[in-house]
């Protein structure tokens, strides 16, 4: 009986001390990767065919850029594109330029109202900003490839995302 009581007490304490990952609201990449979402994250990170030629061109243009990412852990497009984007970010050594990573519910609503304020209609959405001003965004999927789309945005080549008509 004493052992059962100790076991139950230890279980309650352990459960109270662990915080489950909440994919609705703002979270870090580390929190995402250390959660139940790690398997699809790593599978798609490793599967992204990094175009090093384009990454080197992006590198010289990326220094003043900040990126806000709106995603849904429930969304296959987010599961595919967000890890691929982080593979590019890692190649650029630019993790500090990810301004926010925000998880939305299936209605594409954020906990803090920022998704509605930013006009998010599809996920993932990668918003590129310079000096606090949005310069462009990739919505749901790249037009050519993540690397090429990022480069086109940074080179101000009139990039239009899939829903910009």
Predicted ranges, named:
Residues 1-23:
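Bacterial Sec-dependent N-terminal signal peptides
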Residues 19-62:
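N-terminal leader/targeting and pre-domain segments
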Residues 59-91:
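Local sequence-structure signature of Cys/Sec-based thiol-disulfide redox active-site neighborhoods
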Residues 63-66, 97, 131:
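Loop/turn elements at helix/coil->beta-strand transitions in domains of secreted/extracellular proteins
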Residues 69-73, 96-110:
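Thiol-based oxidoreductase modules, predominantly thioredoxin-like and allied folds used
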Residues 73-81, 118, 138, 142:
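Extracytoplasmic/periplasmic, Sec-exported soluble proteins
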Residues 111-122:
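Structural alpha/beta surface segment adjacent to cysteine/selenocysteine redox centers
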Residues 122, 127-165:
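Non-catalytic, surface beta->alpha helical segment in thiol-disulfide oxidoreductase systems
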């Amino acid at each position: 009986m004493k052992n059962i009581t100790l076991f139950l007490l230890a279980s309650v304490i352990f459960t109270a001390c662990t915080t489950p990952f909440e994919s609705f609201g703002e979270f870090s990449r580390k929190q995402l990767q250390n959660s139940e979402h790690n398997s699809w994250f790593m599978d798609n990170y490793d599967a992204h065919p990094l175009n090093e030629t384009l990454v080197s061109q992006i590198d010289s243009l990326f220094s003043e850029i900040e990126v806000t990412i709106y995603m849904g852990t429930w969304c296959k497009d987010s599961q595919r594109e967000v890890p691929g984007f982080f593979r590019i970010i890692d190649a650029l050594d630019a993790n500090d330029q990810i301004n926010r990573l925000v998880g939305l519910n299936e209605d594409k609503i954020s906990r803090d109202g920022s998704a509605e304020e930013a006009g998010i209609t599809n996920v993932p959405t990668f918003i590129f900003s310079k000096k606090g001003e949005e310069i462009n965004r990739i919505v749901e999927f790249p037009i050519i490839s993540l690397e090429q789309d990022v480069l086109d945005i940074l080179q101000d080549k009139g990039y239009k995302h899939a829903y910009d008509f």
